[in-house]
Amino acid sequence: MSWDDEEFEVRTSTKDQPMVVSWDDEFNNDDDDALLESWDAEEVPKQKQKPKAAPKAAKKVDKKGETVLLEIDTLDEKTRKELLKKAELNSDLNNAAALFDGLGVAEEHPRARALRQEEELAALSRPAALTKQTPFESHPLFSEAETKSDFQDLRKALSTAIAGMAEKSSLNYSGALAIDLIRDVAKPLSIESIRQTVATLNVLIKEKERQERQARLAKVKGGTATGGAGKKKAKAARPNLGGAFKKDQEFSLEDNSEFADFGDDDFM
């Protein structure tokens, strides 16, 4: 018996089982990575696939279907135009600044200069806030006082403003303001003017005394403005009976002689 007599079955290639060209083809269907051509080759990490971007969120729509107004839509026409004009001007200025920035142009833009001048004029026309350090002399009533009429207007304004302080504190008004103020104001006056001031104050004193006396006596019945107790009440007068009970006409009931004899006319 020889080896030639034995029959061997030789497997033939089919379309379903293609021939393996390389070792890598054999492991293509495996989960393992393909074999490297050399053991010394560096392993290149695989790039991870970027996740797909999520679709943008759809814009919110009003459930009621109503149009949502912006803040600028609620303004009146004039204000809205001013805001739009200002926004357009700012946009132009920003574009011009970005354009000329690279060119090294240091000159101020005409619109920017006009806007700055307008703001400066508005700041000058705006009245300054009053503080404790604001000098009274800068007020026109002081700085423009020249004629007698101007001084009278100044007096009326000062008297109204200062006299109103008495309502806050009468004690401080008299002790810390009015008395010392009268003295300080009277210092530049001449002696004759001070005497006139004293006479005016004396008249005021008498007027205040009269008012206080009237107010006090108004609470008492029968009082007078001069401080008296008033007129006394007149006593009731006795009725005049025509002298019927005078002494010379008195008669006695015991003397009946006149009534004793009635004469012939006596019916008894």
UniProtKB/Swiss-Prot annotation:
Taxonomic superkingdom: Eukaryota
Record region (Disordered): 1-27, 40-63, 217-249
UniProt keywords, alphabetically: Coiled coil, Cytoplasm, Initiation factor, Protein biosynthesis
Keyword Aminoacyl-tRNA synthetase assigned: no
One MF annotation (Gene Ontology) recorded for this entry: translation initiation factor activity
One of the protein's GO biological processes: nuclear-transcribed mRNA catabolic process, nonsense-mediated decay
Coiled coil: 191-221
Cellular localisation: Cytoplasm
Transferase as UniProt keyword: no
Skewed-composition ranges (Basic residues): 47-58
A GO-annotated cellular component: eukaryotic 43S preinitiation complex
InterPro entries xrefs: eIF3-like_dom_sf, eIF3j
Family: Belongs to the eIF-3 subunit J family.
Cited function: Component of the eukaryotic translation initiation factor 3 (eIF-3) complex, which is involved in protein synthesis of a specialized repertoire of mRNAs and, together with other initiation factors, stimulates binding of mRNA and methionyl-tRNAi to the 40S ribosome. The eIF-3 complex specifically targets and initiates translation of a subset of mRNAs involved in cell proliferation.
Summary of subunit composition and partner proteins: Component of the eukaryotic translation initiation factor 3 (eIF-3) complex.
Annotated protein name in UniProt: Eukaryotic translation initiation factor 3 subunit J
